[in-house]
């Protein structure tokens, strides 16, 4: 999965400003060859059941080649046969429009499911895969029209960044929804994971207390728990969650500040910066942009 991650963590400025980031993905499908009487055709296929076709389109990622694969899964092969039956039950002049309709429905449903499950949406790549699979249906299903052009697919990404004082901004205030639903989610495991990495920094002044095997096992456990915390946060709030981890690492209770300055030096802080910067990749998050301003 392609990731574009810009994560600038300037620890001295974490208490000053943060960036509220919003990404809006809009997919537009333009019909290049609209048929005459399209409204009548749409009305004719409106009541048709195309569930198997929609399920078939949503299955798998290696779209075009799997039609010729003799080892195609039995379930998917049955879905293809049932999809062909659904399309063949539609009037010949309406079959292409039915393919276009089921493609649009499958594309919309995939986006909705990914939003609910907090799975990063792959954008135009996955939409193109659905399109390729749908365009092969007329030939595979022996429809009256062997060629059915879905249309041009355009994916637009709109981003906005607004700098607001971090001290006035609790965890997750990149949007009203983040503020109301995500502020209660803890990030304590991520904080512990980062601090553990700081303690294991080559120049750390903390005493060595564990065997290497025990350290690695504990590190993997904390990293997994940290990733679980971040993945349980809504996608649009991932940036705020990571910034909250950094803020907590830097802003320990006042009574611990003196002790902390003796424990963590410049090398440890560089380790913390690197660990936090790698969190989106390690936890398979999709953070298009996450910037902490320096002034």
UniProtKB/Swiss-Prot annotation:
UniProt keyword terms in alphabetical order: Disulfide bond, Seed storage protein, Signal, Storage protein
Signal peptide: 1-20
UniProt PTM: The 38 kDa precursor may be cleaved into two polypeptides of approximately the same size. The mature protein is composed of a single polypeptide containing one or more intra-molecular disulfide linkages.
Compositional bias ranges of the Polar residues kind: 195-208
Region of interest: Disordered: 195-215
Molecular function per GO: nutrient reservoir activity
Pfam families: Tryp_alpha_amyl (PF00234)
InterPro entries tied to this protein: Bifun_inhib/LTP/seed_sf (IPR036312), Bifunc_inhib/LTP/seed_store (IPR016140), Napin/2SS/CON (IPR000617)
Propeptide, chain numbering: 21-161
Free-text function comment from the UniProt entry: This is a 2S seed storage protein.
PANTHER family listed in its UniProt record: 2S SEED STORAGE PROTEIN 1-RELATED (PTHR35496), 2S SULFUR-RICH SEED STORAGE PROTEIN 2-LIKE (PTHR35496:SF4)
Protein family according to the UniProt entry: Belongs to the 2S seed storage albumins family.
Protein name per the record: 2S seed storage protein
Organism encoding this protein: Helianthus annuus
Species lineage: Eukaryota, Viridiplantae, Streptophyta, Embryophyta, Tracheophyta
């Amino acid at each position: 999965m392609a990731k574009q991650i810009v994560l600038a963590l300037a620890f001295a400025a974490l208490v000053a400003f943060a960036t509220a980031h919003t990404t809006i993905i809009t997919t537009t499908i333009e019909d290049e060859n609209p048929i005459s009487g399209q409204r009548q055709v749409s009305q004719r296929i409106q009541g048709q059941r195309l569930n198997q076709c929609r399920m078939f389109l949503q299955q798998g990622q290696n779209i075009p080649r799997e039609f010729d694969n003799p080892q195609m899964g039995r379930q998917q092969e049955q879905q293809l046969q049932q999809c062909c039956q659904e399309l063949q039950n539609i009037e010949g002049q309406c079959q292409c429009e039915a393919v276009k309709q089921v493609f649009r429905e499958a594309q919309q449903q995939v986006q909705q499911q990914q939003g609910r499950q907090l799975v990063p949406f792959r954008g135009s790549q996955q939409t193109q895969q659905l399109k390729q699979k749908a365009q092969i249906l007329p030939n595979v299903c022996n429809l009256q029209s062997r060629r059915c052009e879905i249309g041009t697919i355009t994916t637009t990404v709109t981003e906005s960044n607004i700098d607001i004082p971090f001290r006035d901004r609790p965890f997750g205030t990149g949007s009203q929804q983040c503020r109301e639903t995500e502020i209660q989610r803890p990030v304590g495991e991520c904080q512990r994971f980062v601090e553990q990495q700081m303690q294991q920094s080559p120049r750390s002044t903390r005493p060595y207390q564990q065997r290497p095997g025990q350290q690695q096992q504990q590190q993997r456990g904390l990293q997994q728990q940290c990733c679980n915390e971040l993945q349980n946060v809504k996608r649009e709030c991932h940036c705020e969650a990571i910034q909250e981890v950094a803020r907590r690492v830097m802003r320990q209770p006042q009574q611990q500040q003196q002790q902390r300055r003796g424990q963590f030096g410049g090398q440890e802080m560089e380790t913390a910066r690197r660990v936090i910067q790698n969190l989106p990749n390690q936890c398979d998050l999709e953070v298009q942009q996450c910037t902490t301003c320096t002034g």
